[in-house]
Amino acid sequence: MGTMLSKQLQVWGILAFLVATILLAGSPGARELGVLVPAEDEVSARQFIASLSKSPQVQEAGLEFKIVVSNTEYPSSQIGSLILAGKFPLALLRSSQIPGYQADDNSLVATSLLSSPLILADSSAQFVAEDSILGVVVEQELGSKGFAALSFWNTAASSIVTKTSVNTARDLMGLKISVPKMQSQDILLEMGATPVSMSADDAVLALDKGLVDASETSVESDGKNESLQTAEGGSLLAQFRHEQGFLVANEDAWVGLRQRERAAIQEAAQEAVRQARLTVLRTEANLPMLAKANSLSYLSFTTLDKEQTAARASWLRDTGNEGKAILELLDEVQRTQPPSPMAPPLAPHSEAPPRIFFATNRNDEGDPDLSYRFGIQRIDSPLSCGEVAYTPDPVRAFGLPHEGEIAVAASQVTKEAKPCASLVSQAGRKNDAVIVFIHGYNNSFDFAVRRAIGFSQDFGVKAPVLVLAWPSQGIGSGYVYDMGSVDYTRPYAKDLIRALLDEKLGTISLLAHSMGSRVAVQVLEFAADAGKPIQNVVFVAPDVPSSNFIQSMRLHGHYAQLATLYANEHDLALKLSKILNRQAPAGLGGADLLLTKGVETVDVSAVDRQTLQTNHSHGFDVPQVASDVSLVLRQRSKASTRNLPSAVHNGFTYWTITP
């Protein structure tokens, strides 16, 4: 008891010093954000938050983090509920602390996959899964529960420590094993062991007294673990279970931050994740020596393929068809190793950079830096519009967004749709055309503008580009929020497109990406209501349910004089959309390729099938596809004139792009 109290006092002393150091270094008027962390993971939690605090972006944004360790008032089991209730703005959260997780909630099926024992071979495989489309699925599951998921948070995988020496997993049969979390129980039962649920502190005592034969335990980065000392002469079986962790925010608190603050936290979180992963790999690499130092034999579950097969089968029994779809997604991610990275071609140099404008219904925060000026709040305010001042990057890889500084030209932002349309149309008179770009889900204002600058140079367009920047939340967990923002944007899009149509330019082209295509089909409806056509509509990877897309084109498609759809069967983002919406989206190719009257469909599956990539932005970063998109935008060329191979299916002609 005295030892435990002494350790707690040491921990609190370290925490007090850390907080005091941050406060002393902080700037006057800094915003303090409380971060609730689980006491059982305090060491790794402190390291993660310390990494956030060191970030120059966080310091420049004037943010400070105050660590609050779970206790009797704020128990670890309630961290998820406390965040949802708004008691804290931020938390480090374990999957088991998400409300509903312990109740076999299939709305968290991908999350449970990443935390189930023996599904993923080791921590490196865990990181690959997190960075793949599967990680986006997990983020969206958290978003459906009301969390703003900002990053993953990794700690070393748990191990099984036994008091008697074991040589294979079969030797666990008949052993009584203490486990801290119920998700370990099923697979241990499959192995013939008897799991006993108890806290980590109780497990050490039970192992010492012989009340259990083994214990599931985690070794922190400092290498200290009382179970190892208690089990002298036994064995350490590593890589048993990776319990997934997250940095999450209360959604209202996240939306309420300034854009500069959100961007700083997101940037800092990327570095904190990198540091945490390095710590995990170092900790796990040290386990064989740690086992030897405690007179334990060492064995890793990574060598036991049979047990991994049993773990998958056990997990599938619990998750049913939903689990099968997610496991297939994992297998697709793991099927092949990523190819050696190839340097993309350089972007073409433009003698006369195209003019870029923006129109946004995002809240105007007034930041002097355009990158941080517009936020993500849905506030009933007039449309903001302006021209972007920029200098083209001296060197930029094809398909990448602009990297240089951006600003508001002449420091002038106009309000309302008609003045905006007038501003843009004046720039478009020379070529009698304008391109309206509607970005997709998980885009910040800054990224959408930078992508528009990049593709406008790559495509060689001469017409001005107007970025319609709707209030996407800008994080992977924001899918539901973003769908709400699409609906919120409807009246703004209506006023803007009608004002543009009234300017009587010769060609208005819509370029819509992903979820932005939902706004684009609204625009077609508004054009139909006004009785004025849109000359050119390009859908790149449209995330619109196929039935909705077909209905919209049947009702309003004749007001698109040329409509082109680019689809890809390897688009993992749209495969995820299919799972979430229980219907294939319009941009998914292959067996789900959408063919309908009034739309020229181009299947790009043969040229965009990169391993471990989402394959969702082919219209911008795959040269063969981008070249075709540029022809459509610059020349309004029909597919039959662009030298594309064609085929016929169910009476409809479609085209393909080949290597």
What are these regions (language model features)?
Residues A343-T414, P419-K430, V449-V465, A469-T507, ...:
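Lipolytic serine-hydrolase domain surface
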Residues A512, G516, A520:
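Gly/Ala-rich beta-loop-alpha elbow adjacent to hydrolase catalytic centers
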Residues G29-L120, G143-M342:
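N-terminal secretory/targeting leader peptides
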Residues N443-A448:
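Short substrate-entry loop that stabilizes the transition state in hydrolases
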Residues L120-S144:
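Short, solvent-exposed loop/beta-turn-alpha elements that line the ligand-binding surface or hinge
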Residues V436-G440, A541:
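The conserved beta1-alpha1 loop
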Residues G2-I14:
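Bacterial N-terminal signal peptides that target proteins for export
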Residues G13-L23:
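Bacterial N-terminal signal peptides
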